[in-house]
């Protein structure tokens, strides 16, 4: 009887499970990639250019075209150049203009991050940009991972990011990849509570996503599939299939969690 009840419960909860699996954000730098990611089942897109350098602000024409073609939520990178994350006054003004262009292009959010010359989170400057971006939510990007990776330092930096008013933090837990930083990401998730969303990212692929999801217990994940397929020569059909596989892994991981709760 107990086995029957569990099977019945899983069947009844399947539609809910499909809707409540962790959210998947995919980074893209072309319109074709954005369309492929949407077809593959992504929930949100991060739009940027020059992914090989970590991403910079895309051309406004790409923002507008993506908005016309894509129904998903789109967040856009606000980064005036590649390299470090310590910006001059002129670069800060450029970031402000880029935020305004993103607003006019009807983007759903922005992704940014400014550090101090010593490598800490520049709370004042970031807070200024967060305020300027409203009502668009702000994701603080992996500039967060540039500093020391010990737990105490990560907690302190997390508090600084929260103080900026950002809604989301993209991080690999102070490591090059999310897989390496799983334990620290989990600590950040616990420490953040409901004050900010922790978004694990960094070489996330179908082969390691299940483990990362189970270890971090995060509610959102970020991937560019860069570790799976060569860019930019990959076929977009393969990119779409890769996104679809990431979605499948998240759904399966959620299903396993449900079954574990039943046992």
Regions found by a protein language model. Give the residues of each.
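Hydrophobic faces of well-ordered beta-strands that scaffold small-molecule active sites
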Residues: 22-26, 45-47, 74-78, 110-112, ...
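Active-site mouth loops of central-metabolism enzymes
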Residues: 19-29, 78-96, 115, 140-153
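Glycine-enriched alpha-helix->loop->beta-strand junction motifs that scaffold or abut catalytic
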Residues: 39-45, 70-73, 106-109, 132-136, ...
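Hydrophobic, well-structured mid-protein blocks that either form specific transmembrane helices
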Residues: 103-164
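Tryptophan (W) side chains
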Residues: 5-8
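Glycine-rich phosphate-binding active-site loops on the catalytic face of alpha/beta enzymes
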Residues: 46-56, 101, 105-117, 166-181, ...
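Alpha-helix-loop-beta-strand connector modules within alpha/beta enzyme cores
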Residues: 55-82, 121-142, 180-205, 238-253
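Catalytic cores of alpha/beta
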Residues: 32-36, 86-98, 145-164, 185-188, ...
């Amino acid at each position: 009887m107990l086995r029957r009840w569990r099977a019945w419960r899983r069947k009844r909860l399947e539609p809910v499970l499909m809707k409540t699996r962790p959210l998947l954000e995919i980074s893209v730098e072309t319109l074709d990639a954005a369309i492929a990611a949407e077809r593959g089942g992504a929930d949100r897109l991060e739009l940027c250019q020059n992914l090989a350098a970590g991403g910079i602000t895309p051309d406004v024409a790409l923002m507008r075209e993506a908005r016309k073609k894509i129904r998903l939520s789109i967040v856009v990178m606000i980064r005036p150049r590649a390299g470090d994350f310590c910006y001059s006054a002129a670069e800060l003004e450029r970031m402000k203009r880029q935020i305004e262009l993103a607003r006019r292009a009807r983007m759903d959010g922005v992704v940014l991050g400014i550090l101090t010359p010593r490598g800490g989170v520049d709370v004042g400057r970031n807070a200024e940009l967060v305020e300027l971006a409203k009502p668009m939510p702000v994701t603080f990007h992996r500039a967060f991972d540039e500093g020391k990776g010990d737990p105490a330092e990560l907690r302190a930096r997390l508090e600084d990011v929260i103080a900026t008013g950002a809604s989301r933090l993209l991080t690999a837990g102070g490591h090059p990849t999310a897989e390496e930083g799983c334990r620290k990401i989990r600590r950040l998730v616990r420490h953040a509570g409901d004050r900010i969303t922790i978004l694990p990212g960094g070489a996330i692929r179908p082969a390691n996503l299940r483990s990362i999801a189970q270890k971090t217990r995060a509610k959102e994940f970020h991937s560019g599939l860069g570790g799976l397929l060569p860019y930019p020569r990959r076929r977009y059909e393969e990119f779409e299939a890769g996104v679809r596989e990431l979605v499948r892994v998240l759904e399966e991981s959620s299903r396993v969690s449900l079954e574990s709760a039943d046992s």
